[in-house]
């Protein structure tokens, strides 16, 4: 059995639904300090692993946001739509990296979540971009990695490695249909997803276009209580919030909202996307 199949089998044994490989050359357009070789100079390949959010967990999110719903159902989504999956992904990434290192290849597992730079709201490495680069997904207008099977309802993790592994091809065509769908723009409670302003990215000649997400509105809206289910407050959101506005919102946060905010994520652009099941 070849190395790639061994890695795929290891990922599948740990309940992973997606597995792909990308060469580091597909990340040449990444920002400085966020390329694979900025993190691991010896890296030649990037592994991308994904786990789907169960449909029942997705329904719990719907239930909590519906007018007649039970708002506490958001805790189900918080635990099993985020925490449980991210823990499984982190353990899988560690196992893959450890397996590769035992084969003589230097490898670095990337955390599944938690941005490393909270001021600029960016992580050390984009697991979403890795999923697209590894042929597992395409970008949606909501900036998320969209799969045909589950839409954006997949969480991802990556492993950088010095092993030169045969890559998967990029997906052909588009999965997100911007001509007939504008759902993510419509459902965003803080208008963080612009209707027309976009970002373009090219990998091996294929152009990807997605929205220029206003990350500060997305983040500050959650702290302000404008986009979350457990909101115990509703603070006014500035027109063009920046990092300092996010800090100001944290200072104004009520005690009840602060205690419940751990389960106060929004996720409308993930849950309401009509692609996949």
What are these regions (language model features)?
Residues 30, 78-277:
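Catalytic cores of enzyme domains
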Residues 1-81:
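Non-catalytic, usually N-terminal nucleic-acid engagement modules in DNA/RNA processing proteins
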């Amino acid at each position: 059995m070849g190395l790639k199949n061994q890695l795929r089998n290891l990922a599948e044994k740990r309940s992973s639904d997606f597995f792909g490989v990308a060469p580091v050359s597909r990340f040449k357009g990444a920002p400085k300090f966020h390329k694979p070789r900025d993190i691991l100079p010896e890296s030649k390949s990037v592994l991308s692993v994904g786990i789907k959010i169960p449909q029942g967990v997705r329904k719990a999110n719907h239930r909590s946001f519906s007018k007649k719903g039970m708002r506490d159902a958001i805790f189900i989504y918080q635990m099993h739509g985020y925490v449980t999956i991210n823990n499984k992904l982190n353990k899988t990434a560690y196992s893959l990296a450890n397996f590769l290192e035992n084969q003589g290849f230097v490898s670095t597992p990337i955390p599944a979540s938690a941005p490393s730079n909270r001021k600029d709201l960016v992580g050390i490495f984009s697991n979403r971009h890795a999923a697209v680069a590894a042929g597992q997904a395409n970008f949606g207008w909501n900036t998320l990695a969209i799969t045909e099977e589950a839409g954006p309802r997949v969480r991802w993790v990556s492993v950088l490695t010095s092993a030169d592994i045969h890559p998967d091809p990029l997906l052909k065509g588009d999965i997100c249909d911007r001509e007939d769908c504008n759902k993510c723009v419509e459902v965003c409670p803080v208008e963080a997803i612009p209707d027309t302003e976009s970002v373009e990215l090219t990998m091996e000649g294929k152009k990807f276009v997605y929205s220029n997400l206003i990350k500060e509105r997305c983040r500050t809206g959650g702290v302000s209580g404008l986009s979350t289910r457990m909101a115990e407050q509703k603070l006014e959101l500035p027109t063009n919030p920046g990092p300092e506005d996010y800090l100001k919102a944290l200072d104004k946060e009520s005690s009840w909202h602060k205690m419940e905010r751990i389960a106060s994520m929004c996720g409308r652009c993930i849950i309401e996307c009509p692609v996949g099941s």
